[in-house]
Amino acid sequence: MTRVNIGIVGCLGKQGRRLVSEISASPYAQVSGGLVRSGNPHVGQILGEVVGCDCSVKITDSLEHLFETSDIVIEFTNPDMLLECIKMAEQKKKPLLSGTTGPAATEMVFEDYIKSIPFLWTTNVSFGVNILAKLVQEAAKKLFDYDIEIWEMHHRYKKDSPSGTSLILGKAAAKGRNVPFQMAQYVRGTPQEARKDVNTIGYSVSRGGADLSDHRVMFVSDEEMIDFNHRTLNKNLYAKGALKAALWLVKQPPGVYTMSDMMAAVE
């Protein structure tokens, strides 16, 4: 069996290290390269020795080399690096999977950049979260007169708020209600706060601890509350999800894809 060669941008970050370990243990894929910033002292070292797994490739600071040696590239970094990766992916005609979060990434119109490659962008590669989004969409449609509240708890270091996962769930709820997502946000504590309309989606954000990820979506009427919850127990969840998504994406024709596309294809 020929294994898929996967390059990893940001290979020594938290998510990058998990990806290196997960892919190295897979019978279906192998790490073809790991990228770090120019000037990183680990450039030229054996990736597996740094991360602590069975991976013999050398760490590089050349984005071009990473794409040339890979069948597909995964990046979980920042919006600026994401844009560089898109340009290089188009140049080298290689599929790209991105899990970069933050407002700048969320506001990008990827169809303006993607012309000749398969590309998947998501703020959460967890199968559980994406299944939850489907349930939330259906509940929002059926429970059309219930208030919708989304609460999240993340580690104290998380920069974006609400999180990308909360936005996935909010978009699903807005789709179920058939209302524009931009019109459906109602964030606690803002100067614009006013009386909540039934078709607005409330967001509450908590931060604390070092390694938390917990999301709740509540549908509330005068008589009852229905509560959906997703809690991450092990961050390896994201590496497993990214690997599954990459193995699917590498077989697709050019286009912009979502996790929903992938999950619909494997049903």
Curated annotation (Swiss-Prot):
The keyword Cell inner membrane does not apply. GO terms for molecular function: 4-hydroxy-tetrahydrodipicolinate reductase; NAD binding; NADP binding; oxidoreductase activity, acting on CH or CH2 groups, NAD or NADP as acceptor. Keywords: Amino-acid biosynthesis, Cytoplasm, Diaminopimelate biosynthesis, Lysine biosynthesis, NAD, NADP, Oxidoreductase. Coiled coil: none annotated. SUPFAM superfamilies: Glyceraldehyde-3-phosphate dehydrogenase-like, C-terminal domain, NAD(P)-binding Rossmann-fold domains. The active site is at H154, K158. PROSITE patterns: DAPB (PS01298). Pathway: Amino-acid biosynthesis; L-lysine biosynthesis via DAP pathway; (S)-tetrahydrodipicolinate from L-aspartate: step 4/4. (S)-2,3,4,5-tetrahydrodipicolinate binds at H155, G164, T165. NADP(+) binds at R37. Its main location: cytoplasm. One of its GO terms (cellular component) is cytoplasm. GO terms for biological process: diaminopimelate biosynthetic process; lysine biosynthetic process via diaminopimelate. It is an enzyme of class 1 (oxidoreductase). It catalyses: (S)-2,3,4,5-tetrahydrodipicolinate + NAD(+) + H2O = (2S,4S)-4-hydroxy-2,3,4,5-tetrahydrodipicolinate + NADH + H(+); (S)-2,3,4,5-tetrahydrodipicolinate + NADP(+) + H2O = (2S,4S)-4-hydroxy-2,3,4,5-tetrahydrodipicolinate + NADPH + H(+). Its EC number is 1.17.1.8. It is found in: Cytoplasm. Signal peptide: none annotated. NAD(+) binds at G10, C11, L12, G13, K14, Q15, G99, T100, T101, T122, T123, N124, V125. PANTHER family: 4-HYDROXY-TETRAHYDRODIPICOLINATE REDUCTASE 1, CHLOROPLASTIC-RELATED (PTHR20836:SF0), DIHYDRODIPICOLINATE REDUCTASE (PTHR20836). Belongs to the DapB family. NCBIfam families: dapB. Catalyzes the conversion of 4-hydroxy-tetrahydrodipicolinate (HTPA) to tetrahydrodipicolinate. This is 4-hydroxy-tetrahydrodipicolinate reductase. It comes from Ehrlichia chaffeensis (strain ATCC CRL-10679 / Arkansas).
